[in-house]
């Protein structure tokens, strides 16, 4: 993981993955600048339900079911509609459905680990998923990455893409994670933590987490591909 010109020396993979040459600026095409306009028409029925969108009929993935929900806002607190949100995550055991995941943890055949949703007219979004597991990484010996979900947000055009991660309130691994702790502002780190929301608990089985996303301003969510303060 690299935030433009920032490399996290404690997370060695960020050094090997970071570009070593100056970026090339390419003029954007008119289609990139003017579209697309997202609407619910591009969504499939269960795109925001990760407990169903990859599972076999009559089966469900393993793990604690959760709701992750919130609002996408601008710096003035205005809710933003028609924002395409895509998420991806590890399964309950901490395994990604990706060919480059070196973990020996078994894949959950009923969990794909990705979903998408378009914010409603009041900027609201919601996903039903499985609480992801933490997983070890070899950059600094026996350390683990805390539970997290990756978020990608598209605005009214493909050039407006922002990427971030949501962590889980109370996870003891957060304090030792070099990625979130590379953010110097402790208040900015707090904005990346999804808060337990018991009002969203359903049928005494599904836990709720609230994660609002602010795109600009002093209280903006920290994005991996956007400079601080921009």
Give names to the regions the model predicted.
Residues 4-230:
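Beta-strand-dominated extracellular/periplasmic modules and repeats
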């Amino acid at each position: 993981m690299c935030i433009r010109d920032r490399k996290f020396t404690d997370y060695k993979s960020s050094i090997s993955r970071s570009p070593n040459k100056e970026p090339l600026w390419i003029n954007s095409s008119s289609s990139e600048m003017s579209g697309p306009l997202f609407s619910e028409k591009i969504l499939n029925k269960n795109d925001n339900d990760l407990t169903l969108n990859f599972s076999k009929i009559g089966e469900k993935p393993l793990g604690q079911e959760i709701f992750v929900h919130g609002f996408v806002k601008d710096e003035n607190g205005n809710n933003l509609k028609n924002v395409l949100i895509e998420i991806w995550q590890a399964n309950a055991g901490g395994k990604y459905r990706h060919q480059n995941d070196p973990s020996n943890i078994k894949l959950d055949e009923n969990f794909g680990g990705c979903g998408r949703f378009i914010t409603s007219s009041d900027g609201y979004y919601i996903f039903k998923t499985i609480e992801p597991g933490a997983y070890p990484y070899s950059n600094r010996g026996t350390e683990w990455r805390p539970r997290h979900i990756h978020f990608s947000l598209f605005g009214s055009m493909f050039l407006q893409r922002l990427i971030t991660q949501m962590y889980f309130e109370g996870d003891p691994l957060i304090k030792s994670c070099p990625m979130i702790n590379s953010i110097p502002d402790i208040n900015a780190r707090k904005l990346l933590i999804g808060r337990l929301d018991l009002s969203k608990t359903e049928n005494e089985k599904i836990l709720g987490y609230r994660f609002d996303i602010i795109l600009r301003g002093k209280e903006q969510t920290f994005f991996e591909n956007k400079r601080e303060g921009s």
